[in-house]
């Protein structure tokens, strides 16, 4: 597939089009909290379809801003930002935990009542609670770019994995929202759960508590497992579409994008785990022996 063809496929959407076959579940939550619904999902979907590429624009501006602020901080002392950091991480932890609890009802109920194929290939009801939390998920990816600002302003090490992950997730999430990617049920749930652990860990650390090493190792393990599971889920959708010739609400172009992102994420997270917990531990144990 040539780049121009791939780009064209990324911009070809069938949702709400004239020949679109409805592939959504009809499940409705038994209870809605006030405002827990997307008003006019068709409007928002078409808006995403028209302007999803601006997620790339935002990502480019994000990279530029990183360089500008790093230059600004070059000869300045780091900011402490203890309390803003606690509030920031605490708010994102609370959001992720609530989102996990509310969103998980839809895929878990679908797995139990409708089976794996429909859960994998039929997207959630666009007028119900799961759609609201899917929409909130997309918006949260913009908010989470703020994580990087705390790292730079506090002059902490900024690794490639961090900013690549933030930018790539934003782009993929917005595109998936534009085409109602059904497997997003799994992608979103995994990310919400991982972030529930991650931001809770960050909040406690920002408060000054020193947690055992196994806690951070567990968080990284969950994140790495999420990426490997993402590769597996994407491969299953590809198999359903190409080998079994069954309909599935996820375009081939979006699948290719998912493969690239999840494979690179898996590699980078494994590398990070090895460097942070295996090589580092090995060096520490050697230095202790030498002493």
Swiss-Prot record:
The record ties this protein, via InterPro entries, to: ELO_CS, ELO_fam
Cysteine pairs bridged by disulfides in the record: none
A cellular-component GO term for this protein: endoplasmic reticulum membrane
Question: For this chain's UniProt record, which GO biological process terms are given?
Answer: fatty acid elongation, monounsaturated fatty acid; fatty acid elongation, polyunsaturated fatty acid; fatty acid elongation, saturated fatty acid; sphingolipid biosynthetic process; very long-chain fatty acid biosynthetic process
Specify the protein's topology with respect to the membrane.
Answer: Multi-pass membrane protein
In this record, what's one Pfam family? ELO
User: Where does the record say this protein resides?
Assistant: Membrane
Q: Which UniProt keywords apply?
A: Fatty acid biosynthesis, Fatty acid metabolism, Lipid biosynthesis, Lipid metabolism, Membrane, Transferase, Transmembrane, Transmembrane helix
GO MF annotation terms: fatty acid elongase activity
Q: In which pathway does it act?
A: Lipid metabolism; fatty acid biosynthesis
The transmembrane residues are 46-66, 79-99, 254-274
Highest taxon in the source lineage: Eukaryota
Functional summary from the UniProt entry: Could be implicated in synthesis of very long chain fatty acids.
- Please give the PANTHER family that the UniProt record associates with this protein: FATTY ACID ACYL TRANSFERASE-RELATED, FATTY ACID ELONGATION PROTEIN 4-RELATED
The Swiss-Prot or TrEMBL record describes its family as follows: Belongs to the ELO family.
Name by which UniProt lists this protein: Putative fatty acid elongase 4
Give the organism the record lists: Caenorhabditis elegans
């Amino acid at each position: 597939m040539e780049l121009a063809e791939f780009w064209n496929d990324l911009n070809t959407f069938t949702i709400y089009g004239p020949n679109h076959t409805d592939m959504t579940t009809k499940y409705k939550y038994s209870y809605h909290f006030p405002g827990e619904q997307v008003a006019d999902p068709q409007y928002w979907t078409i808006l995403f379809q028209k302007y999803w590429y601006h997620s790339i624009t935002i990502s480019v501006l994000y990279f530029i801003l990183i360089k500008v602020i790093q230059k600004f901080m070059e000869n300045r002392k780091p900011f402490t930002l203890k309390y803003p950091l606690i509030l920031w991480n605490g708010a994102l932890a609370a959001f992720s935990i609530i989102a996990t609890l509310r969103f998980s009802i839809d895929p878990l109920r679908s797995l139990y009542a409708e089976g794996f194929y429909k859960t994998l290939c039929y997207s959630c009801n666009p007028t119900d609670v799961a759609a609201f939390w899917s929409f909130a998920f997309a918006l949260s990816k913009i908010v989470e770019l703020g994580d990087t600002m705390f790292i730079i302003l506090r002059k902490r090490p900024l690794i490639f994995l961090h900013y690549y992950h933030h930018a790539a997730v934003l782009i993929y999430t917005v595109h998936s929202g534009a085409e109602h990617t059904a497997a997003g049920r799994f992608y979103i749930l995994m990310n919400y759960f991982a972030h529930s652990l991650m931001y809770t860990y960050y909040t406690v650390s920002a408060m000054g508590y020193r947690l055992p090493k196994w806690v951070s190792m567990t968080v990284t393990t969950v994140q790495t497992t999420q990426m490997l599971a993402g590769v597996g889920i994407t491969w299953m959708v590809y198999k359903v579409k190409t080998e079994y010739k069954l309909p599935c609400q996820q375009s081939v172009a979006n699948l290719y994008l998912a493969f690239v992102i999840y494979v690179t994420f898996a590699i980078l997270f494994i590398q990070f785990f090895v460097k942070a917990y295996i090589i580092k531990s090995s060096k520490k144990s050697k230095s202790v022996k030498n002493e």
